[in-house]
Design a protein with these regions (language model features):
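Bacterial N-terminal signal peptides that target proteins for export
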Residues: 3-12
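Bacterial N-terminal signal peptides
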Residues: 12-21
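Acidic/polar low-complexity flexible segments
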Residues: 27-58, 136, 142-191, 237-282
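Sequence context of c-type cytochrome heme-c attachment sites
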Residues: 28-68, 82-107
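The canonical Cys-X-X-Cys-His
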Residues: 68-78, 162
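Beta-strand-rich interaction surfaces with strong enrichment in secreted/lumenal proteins
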Residues: 106-109, 216-222
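Short, well-ordered beta-strand segments enriched in hydrophobic/aromatic residues
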Residues: 116-123, 227-233
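Short helix-loop boundary/capping segments
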Residues: 177-220
């Protein structure tokens, strides 16, 4: 009888291992050497929240946004940004002090299967932050995906969450975080501190650093001077086959925090449809 129990137990264990194995197989990362790359520039945006973007006296591009143009449609030229970086770094738009490097490239790759979306980001994080106060994390990398209810989400990317009255903005409330007036973003973040957990959150009427339902997993690290960060999350919520989802990337480099990040403009990620970043079906 004892032998019988042992056999039953080992079969049960074997079954559990098989089930676990198949879960892992479902989340098998793609062969990144076969996945197309799209490089975007991330930049220090200073004090240019959505209110600034939509104020004609500050930003002549407001007219284009109102006509339905995207920020990137106007500002990305031959893979670079046509901004006046001197103005962005000036006291007018960065009253505290700008980082030494105003922009740098991030290469994005995306793939998906029935269950999951996989996103890989590679970049060299610059030193020279103005205010390196995050002692635990040399680098943090976040991505946000907008749902269909975010006004102008496919034009402005993450700017719909970026407001002049949020923390680290001049004269703003230190407790007030990113928020949207309507709609929601799914948020995921990698932190470089040893043992830091993946952030699976959202931005609604405030920023929530947990409570997301995307089952976000992330692996990140540095080889030489290049960071590679790979997110795995459920193909769910705003992400679905047949959809092009607005997204943005933010990198806090050199222990930066708050608004002292380098951000991308809004791009789209397409799952089975055309987009700025086309996700490769596995």
């Amino acid at each position: 009888e004892c032998e019988m129990k042992k056999t039953t137990f080992s079969l049960a264990l074997f079954g559990a291992l098989l089930a676990f194995g198949s879960q892992l197989a479902q989340a098998a990362a793609p062969d990144w050497s076969k996945v197309p790359k799209r490089t975007v520039q991330v930049f220090h945006a200073g004090v240019t929240p959505v209110e600034w973007v939509m104020k004609k006296s500050e930003h002549s591009g407001r007219t284009g946004v109102n006509k339905g143009e995207s920020c990137v449609g106007c500002h990305e030229e031959k893979g670079n940004l046509n901004f006046d970086m001197k103005r962005l770094a000036s006291k007018e738009l960065e009253p505290k002090g700008a980082p030494k490097t105003m922009s740098f490239p991030v290469t994005i790759q995306s793939a998906y299967d029935k269950e999951n979306a996989y996103v890989r980001l590679t970049f060299k994080a610059p030193a020279g932050a103005f205010d390196p106060v995050d002692k635990e994390n040399e680098v943090k990398v976040a991505m946000m995906f907008a749902n269909a209810d975010v006004p102008k989400g496919d034009q402005v990317g993450c700017w719909a969450t970026c407001h002049g009255d949020a923390r680290t903005m001049p004269g703003a409330d230190d407790k007030k975080t990113k928020y949207t007036k309507s709609g929601a973003y799914e948020l995921m973040q990698w932190k470089s501190a040893a043992g830091a957990k993946a952030v699976d959150g959202s931005v609604t009427d405030k920023r929530n650093m947990e409570g997301g339902t995307a089952n976000v997993q992330v692996e990140g690290g540095k080889s030489g001077d290049t960071y590679t960060v790979t997110f795995t999350r459920k193909l769910s919520g705003a992400l679905a086959e047949g959809k092009a989802v607005p997204f943005g990337v933010a990198v806090h480099a050199d222990h930066a925090t708050g608004r002292f990040h380098h951000v991308s403009m809004g791009y789209t990620m397409g799952f089975g449809v055309d987009a700025d970043v086309k996700s490769a079906k596995q």
